[in-house]
């Protein structure tokens, strides 16, 4: 037997040695993967919404809010917006590039609100909010509000909203061709 081999010794329970496993030191926290930009923004948005609920008089619990509180949150956010939205009475109403300043308010852009609702909808479900059917962020009134905001901002700014067409990728075309090729019988010929 070699002398450099260490044989474990039994220590009495009241005198543990430094090599024993009686007192496990906590492992240092494992470095977490940094959150993606989307996940970081979703967490920030959720925390902002929760803080908004707590600031209400009386403060609201997560189980107490509904779509009306979501709508009031969206209106509250307008004060921090950076998009000029002209009133109908403004001389620059409907002009995309007004030649001068006006006193019309800055509001949240429709696209920002739409993305925010998407992130909050996902965050609500992640925080145990229940089924997508009961998600206040997915309520039809929220969709109607967003549509109205989009249309009014498009008119006020003179920039019509056009839905971007989705391009088909090569893979989609190949799949379609494969489906057509696979649907024919082996004995059939195309002439």
UniProtKB/Swiss-Prot annotation:
Polar residues: compositionally biased ranges: 181-191
Domain of life: Eukaryota
Subcellular location: Nucleus
GO cellular component: nucleus
Gene Ontology terms, MF aspect: DNA binding
Keyword hit for Phosphoprotein: no
Biased composition (Basic and acidic residues): 1-14
InterPro entries: ALOG, ALOG_dom
Predominant cellular place of this UniProt entry's protein: nucleus
Region (Disordered): 1-41, 153-191
One matching Pfam family: ALOG_dom
GO BP terms: mRNA transcription; post-embryonic plant morphogenesis
Motif window: Nuclear localization signal: 163-167
Keyword terms: Developmental protein, DNA-binding, Nucleus, Transcription, Transcription regulation
Limits of the ALOG domain: 37-165
Family affiliation: Belongs to the plant homeotic and developmental regulators ALOG protein family.
Protein name: Protein LIGHT-DEPENDENT SHORT HYPOCOTYLS 9
Organism: Arabidopsis thaliana
């Amino acid at each position: 037997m070699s002398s450099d081999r260490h044989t474990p010794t039994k220590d009495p329970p009241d005198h543990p040695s430094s090599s024993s496993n009686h007192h496990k030191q906590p492992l240092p926290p494992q470095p977490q993967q940094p959150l993606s930009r989307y996940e970081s923004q979703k967490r920030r948005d959720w925390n902002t919404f929760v803080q908004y609920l707590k600031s209400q008089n009386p403060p609201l619990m997560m189980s107490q809010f509904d779509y009306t509180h979501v709508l009031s949150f969206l209106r509250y956010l307008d004060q921090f917006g950076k998009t000029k939205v002209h009133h109908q009475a403004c001389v620059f109403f409907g002009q995309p590039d007004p030649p001068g300043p006006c006193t019309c308010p800055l509001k949240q852009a429709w696209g920002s609100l739409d993305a925010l609702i998407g992130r909050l909808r996902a965050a609500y479900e992640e925080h145990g909010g229940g089924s997508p059917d009961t998600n206040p962020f997915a309520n039809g009134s929220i969709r109607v509000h967003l549509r109205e905001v989009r249309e009014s901002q498009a008119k006020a700014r003179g920039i019509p909203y056009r839905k971007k067409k989705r391009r088909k990728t090569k893979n989609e075309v190949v799949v379609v061709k494969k489906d057509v090729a696979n649907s024919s019988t082996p004995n059939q010929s195309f002439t």
